[in-house]
Amino acid sequence: WNLNQEDIYKIILDRGEGKISKDGAMVVKTGIHTGRSAQDKFVVKESNNKDSIWWDNAKEMSEENFDLLYSDMIEFSDNKDLFVQDLFGGADLEYRLPTRIYTEYAWHSLFIQNLLITVKEEEKSKFDPEFVIIDMPSFKANPARHGSRSETIIAVNFDKKIVLIAGTSYAGEIKKSVFTMLNFLLPPKNVMPMHCSVNVGSDDDSAIFFGLSGTGKTTLSA
C-alpha cells in the first residue's frame, strides 16, 4: 500500500514485469495494446450525465452490466496481490481529485505514481478517495456477460466515481481515466480542463501548447 519507488522497482524486477535499462529507466512490454483502446471505452448512462456527454462519440453501458463487471473483477482479484496508490489528480488544492488506484501489476503502480501527485505525510490521515480506479490487465471481459465489445474494456461510472480497466496492459488507460473524471467534474465548477503544457517566459508571460498525444507539448514546454 503506497509503496515507494525503490520498493516497487524491486518488486517489478522480482516478478519479471520489467528490466532496467542502462540509463536506469524501467523497461516493460504492454502486450498487444501499445496505445489506448478508445473503441472499448464505455460510460454508464444516467440521469446526471445524459445531457452532458457527447453520446455520438461515447459508448453507453447499463448500470447492471457495470455492477456485474465490478463484482466479477473483485472476485477475480481475491487471491491476487494488488498494489494501491493514494494520489491527487491535479495540483490546485481547491480542485484536485483524491484518487485511489488498485493495480494488478507493480509497474502500473509505479507509472501512475510518477504521473500524479503524492499525498504528503501530514495529509495521509485525512486522505479520503473521491475517485477509484481498478486496473486488472489479466481479467478478460465477456461481451455476452458484460456488454463489452471485446475482452478489453474501460468502464466509466461517473455517478459512483469508479473506473474499471480490464484486458489491456497499456498503462496510459489509468492516466486517461483520471483526465476523464476531471473533464466531467471540473466544468460545472467553472474550470476548463485542457490537454496542454505551459511554460513561462522571462517576463512572467505564459504560453500554452495544445496538441495530440506525442506531438511535442512537453518537449516544447521543458
Regions found by a protein language model. Give the residues of each.
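Glycine-rich phosphate-binding P-loop
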Residues: 200-222
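A noncatalytic interaction/capping subdomain that flanks phosphate/NTP-handling catalytic cores
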Residues: 1-206
